[in-house]
Amino acid sequence: MAKRIEIPYNGKKYTLEFTRSTVSSMEKSGFSINELGSKPATMIPMLFSGAFAANHPSTKVATINKIYDGLGDKQGLVKALAEMYSDSVYTLLADEDEDSEGNPGWEAVE
């Protein structure tokens, strides 16, 4: 599964990816991965532009829109972006290392 997508455009290479921080910003802006199918006209542009935030935060919306409009296989692109987004969310719950030596533990108490 892809962690990044690279897009060459007008002599520049754009690296698209998501981080916990960019995912959080997207959610605060109203993005919901669960609404991707029911509100595609809103959520797909938010998903695509959100992927620029980690490495290209100052890219203008007009440039992002031109890049998107010129790309082929948009269904494949949106699928890959959605998987990358979801992977970033899952890092909040994943145990990075099975070896927990030295890491704090937790316990539920009554």
Residue ranges and their predicted role:
Residues A53-H56:
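Extended, low-hydrophobicity segments enriched in charged/polar residues
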Residues Y14-L16:
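Short, isolated positions in well-ordered beta-strands
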Residues M1-Y9, F31-N34, S38, T42, ...:
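Charged interaction scaffolds used for protein-protein
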